[in-house]
Amino acid sequence: MLSRILALADTGAGAESESATSSATTVERTWDVIVWNDPVTPMDVVVVILRRIFGYSTGRCTQLMLRVHHEGRAVVWTGRRQRAEQYCVRLQVAGLRCTIEQAT
């Protein structure tokens, strides 16, 4: 079951850093991808999913998972809206609760 979830989540490239770009006429806003705590998904599975989708180190994924566990949520990625939506869908397909919101 876990391998099927990971296979579904493992579609696309690893995370790349994206920053807001501005020009004389437009300013592109950045968006946060937020993972929310749930009572179902084991912590080690969250680490594996984050590692597969974003390509982060195990240590970074563990820190993010612990933040989700203790604080109820964690921003796991920030960048352009389209990419944030793609990551959110992949996280949801993998079984995690996820939303996006404008970065502050």
Predicted ranges, named:
Residues 1-104:
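Terminal domain-initiation and capping elements
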